[in-house]
Amino acid sequence: MSTRLWEAQFVFSMADDADPDCAMAYWGQAMTQIHPLWQDNLNAEEYARGLELTKKAQSIADTTQREKQYFKAAEVFYAGGLSQTMKEGYVNMSRIWDETSTSMPNDMDAKAFNALFKIAIAKSEDDREVAGQLALDILQEMSNHPGGHHYVIHAFDTANLAGK
């Protein structure tokens, strides 16, 4: 795990220490193990830990519909475990991020995750362009959204799409 991801995992862990009822702290820890841009494989222990953290987040009663959707995206990834490829896990997550960003069109973070997982599952430059357009749409709404900028770069990072 990179230093930045380790730091993120540590900070989310500090958040759940400070507030054990902060469901997003558990979800955040689970998400630090998922790396769709470089698609490293997880082992059985990592899948189990991610699912455990996700289930902990889901067990906290006072969560919003938005949070429940975020937890659902992590759950579909982790629940498949080693019986699915990483790509299949990302496809499952992408489906949930599609649902979430459609049902909550003002949620720029859901749109950013949608763009991220579309990049991860892209089979063609057309698919990457769709992901890039999602990221550009975020920037139309919120010009300083870091995910929007980050995923525009990754989506269009091919010789044919570079000028977009």
Write out the residue ranges for each language-model feature.
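Amphipathic alpha-helices of TPR/Sel1-like and other helical repeat/solenoid scaffolds
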Residues: L5-A15, R49-I60, G89-M104, D127-M142, ...
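Alpha-helical segment of the N-proximal tetratricopeptide repeat
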Residues: M1-V11, F71, E75-M86
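Post-signal peptide N-terminal segment of secreted/secretory-pathway proteins
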Residues: E7-E67
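Amphipathic alpha-helical repeat scaffolds of TPR domains
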Residues: D21-L37, D62-L82, P105-K123, M142-A159
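Short coil/turn and helix-start
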Residues: S2, Q39-E45, L82-E88, K123-D126
